[in-house]
């Protein structure tokens, strides 16, 4: 709403600095509150030697369009009414009217650098549902979808037109061509957005309105059409496409991960969505690379297209810090290693390959030597034969060396040599 009035020059500064930002304002007519809003702009100017002041008011929902926010809504069972309540809880006294089935959102929703109004407008546009406001009350009251508001008032038909472009654009809504015929009406009666009336046996709904006070007389201009033809074209989160958001792993299951996004820290929403984890290699038969991150690991969530539900976790971002006085696992870029929280590790370095599992391990040097060690035991077993072939073979035991087959035939070396068998031949 804009209000223009004549002002005295000496009052301009007092008015300009004396008005508080978002100061409430209202318009009454015939004992009825026609408009309630907040002051969002003030301008003083001269026209034909007359000094004028213009005040601009917007409905209270302008508070929802002031701050850019980033957060995720991971609970796919949340209903549309639950989403509205979650958003509107930041605005005391805010109310809403949901005029479409209260279904579960059924997908991941991400609000990324959007105001609450921009976000809700985008979400409901996916259902072809417009977002509107009720002007005739103080505070915030929004319409999600087109409500049923019956009524009748005096009017005069001013114009009739149809947009062929809208007929084609909104074909997916299921409305017919006649639903996109606009009726322009003039009236002295103030009606709200989505108000309805009967015209030639059909119900028309206000989709656009304009009021103007001229010489003490209020002129109202309305554009109405069939409710079935009032919709919002889907808006997609193009600002999300190609970005990667930081987070940390909470839980791992199969090839899926549950994460907490850093941007959700101020909001505390439930982290219940399972994201697919993109491995280095995967095929339909299950072959490829399976190495999942661990709880607590830092990760990035990538959004490859305009559909937030297609998001996937692409990699882990290391926050490793070298231990003081210890060996830095990332100290030498020439050494590539793979390890897990259980202590197993494989390293590929300039000198060879090293594999360890805490108290046992294997080393293959570039020099040609292979070392196998274990603090408990080392077992070499084959269904067929085990062959040792070398220029020299040395077998050492701290207390004894024993070679025995399952029949009990063999040799034992302690401080003495003991040979056992059904028959022992010594030449």
Residue ranges and their predicted role:
Residues 28-33, 90, 200-204, 302-309:
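Short, charged beta-turn/beta-strand-edge "cap" motif at the junction between a beta-strand
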Residues 17-21, 190-192, 292-293:
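Short, well-ordered loop/turn sites that connect or cap secondary structure elements
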Residues 60, 77-97, 250-272:
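Glycine-rich, acidic and aromatic/proline-enriched surface loops and short helix-turn segments
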Residues 205-212, 216-348:
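Exposed beta-strand/loop interface patches that mediate assembly or binding
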Residues 47-48, 78, 82-97, 101-228:
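Extended, domain-scale alpha-helical bundle/helix-rich regions
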Residues 12-95, 108-109, 121-125, 134:
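Surface-exposed cap/loop segments at beta↔alpha junctions
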Residues 87, 123, 133, 266-267, ...:
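Right-handed beta-helix
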Residues 34-44, 202-212, 247:
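Short beta-strand-centered aromatic/proline hotspots
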């Amino acid at each position: 709403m804009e209000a223009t009035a004549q002002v005295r020059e000496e009052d301009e500064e007092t008015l300009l600095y004396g008005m508080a930002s978002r100061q409430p304002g209202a318009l009454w007519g015939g004992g009825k509150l026609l408009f309630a809003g907040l002051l969002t702009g003030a301008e003083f100017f001269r026209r034909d030697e007359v000094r004028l002041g213009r005040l601009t008011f917007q409905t209270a929902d302008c508070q929802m369009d002031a701050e850019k926010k980033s957060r995720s809504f991971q609970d796919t069972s949340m209903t549309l009414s639950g989403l509205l309540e979650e958003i509107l809880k930041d605005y005391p006294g805010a109310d809403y009217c949901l005029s479409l089935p209260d279904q579960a959102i059924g997908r991941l929703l991400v609000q990324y650098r959007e105001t609450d109004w921009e976000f809700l407008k985008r979400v409901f546009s996916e259902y072809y549902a417009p977002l509107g406001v009720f002007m005739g009350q103080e505070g915030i009251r929004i319409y999600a979808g087109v409500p049923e508001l019956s009524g009748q008032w005096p009017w005069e038909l001013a114009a009739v037109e149809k947009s062929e472009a809208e007929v084609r654009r909104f074909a997916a809504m299921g409305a017919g061509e006649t639903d996109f015929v606009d009726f322009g009406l003039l009236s002295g009666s103030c009606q709200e957005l989505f108000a309805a009336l009967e015209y030639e046996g059909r119900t028309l709904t206000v989709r656009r309105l304009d009021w103007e006070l001229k010489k003490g007389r209020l002129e109202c201009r309305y554009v109405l059409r069939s409710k079935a033809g009032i919709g919002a074209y889907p808006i997609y989160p193009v600002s999300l496409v190609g970005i990667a958001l930081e987070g940390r792993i909470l839980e791992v299951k199969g090839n899926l991960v549950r994460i907490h996004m850093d941007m959700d820290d101020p909001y505390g929403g439930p982290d219940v969505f399972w994201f697919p984890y993109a491995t280095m290699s995967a095929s339909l038969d299950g072959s490829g690379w399976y190495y999942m991150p661990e709880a607590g690991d830092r990760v990035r969530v990538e959004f490859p297209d305009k559909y937030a539900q297609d998001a996937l976790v692409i990699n882990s971002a290391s926050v490793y810090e070298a231990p003081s006085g210890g060996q830095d696992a990332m100290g030498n870029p020439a050494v590539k290693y793979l390890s897990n929280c259980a202590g197993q590790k494989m390293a590929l370095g300039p000198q060879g390959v090293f594999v360890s599992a805490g108290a046992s391990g294997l080393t293959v040097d570039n020099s040609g030597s292979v070392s196998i060690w274990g603090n408990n035991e080392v077992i070499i077993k084959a269904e067929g034969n085990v062959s040792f072939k070398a220029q020299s073979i040395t077998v050492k035991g701290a207390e004894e060396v024993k070679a025995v087959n399952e029949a009990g035939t063999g040799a034992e070396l302690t401080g003495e040599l003991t040979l056992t068998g059904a028959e022992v031949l010594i030449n």
